[in-house]
Amino acid sequence: MYQCPNCGGRLIFDISSQSMLCEHCNTHYNPYKLGEGNSAEESKEYDVTVFKCPQCGGEIMSTDNTIADFCSFCGASTVLESRISKELRPGYIIPFSKTKQDCKNQYKKMMKRAWFAPKELKDEKYIDGFRGIYMPYWAYHVSQKGPVVLRGEKSKRRGDYIYTDHFNINGDMDCQYKGISFDASSSFDDNISEAIAPYDVKNMAGFTPAFLSGFYADTADVGCDVYMNDAIDMAGEETYDYVSNNIPLGGVSLHETESTIKSKCNAVIESVDRTLYPVWFLSYRNRDRVAYATVNGQTGKVSADLPVSVGRYFAGSALLAVPIFILLNMFFTLRPKVTLNVVAVIALITIILYLSLIHI
């Protein structure tokens, strides 16, 4: 735990000021000035308290030793087991820039469209359970260098004939992609991490454990080799899009598929950095059903896997069905053509409602 040099109070990372704040005397400090000592800067490890859920086995860690009384992964309300441990130091971190209140506001805005969600998910006490967790990521630096030859063609019509000229387009490639990121935690579902992406890696800062004060961090248990091919493939997609849409070729169109351009990129992974990215995390548990709401701690982007309240669903269906029944019986004679049109309108409304809900 970080203590205030002025009064001995607890220091936490304050998102609004991007500095360390004393909870007692309100003094601010630079996170990098609260030293672990010069030897610690060269160390590959740092001290943490690891909290383990006795029910699901999920682990989070913190530089604080305060008691964690619920699990963010399975939603269990239980005191987590704790132990002192050492963790490998990340190279970089993206500090939280969205406060808990920002996070709650974004979540409430999304929940206005969640008509069939259980009312508990809109309760202020429940929403206050958002927990700030730094999720581990691997950030890949991919380079593409060397000569490349692409095929192109240009067609023109003369009378009744179309003439096509074929070209070899020669160039030297020098592309650098830094910060292609994939989450490094098996407990953090890839679908969730993709839903709240991207992060702006230009705002990464050098890591110091002070950034974790007042927050938690997940442990990295997925090796960097798992996503190497995905990183190379993603870099290839970016190069293909750029070559296809941004390079002027004088009317010559590329005669190359995405896969062939990727194969000619000579991609190499230059380096892989261990990083931490900020996520506001909220879990909901009802019997065996666990649902999550996550907010990108840098951009405020929200993603949620929301359960459906059966009671609200049937109530909403009844409210919709009754006026339709009255309308059809009082004002229309049900003929095949009328019925077909009514069904088409209802289907269109249903599709619109469905699309609006799946984008939550």
Stretch-by-stretch model annotation:
Residues 1, 17-19, 46-50, 68:
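Residues immediately within or flanking Cys/His clusters that coordinate Zn2+
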Residues 10-12, 30, 61, 79:
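Short functional micro-motifs and their immediate structural scaffolds
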Residues 16-21, 34-39, 64-70, 83-89:
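Short cysteine/histidine-rich zinc-coordinating motifs and their immediately flanking basic loops
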Residues 26-33, 74-82:
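Short Cys/His-rich micro-motifs in 6-15 aa windows
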Residues 4-7, 22-25, 53-56, 71-74:
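Short cysteine-rich clusters marking metal-coordination/redox-active sites
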Residues 273-324, 351:
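Extended hydrophobic
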Residues 358-360:
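Conserved small/polar residues in nucleotide/adenosyl-binding loops
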Residues 86-289, 311, 315, 333, ...:
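Charged, low-complexity helical/coil segments in non-catalytic cytosolic or luminal regions
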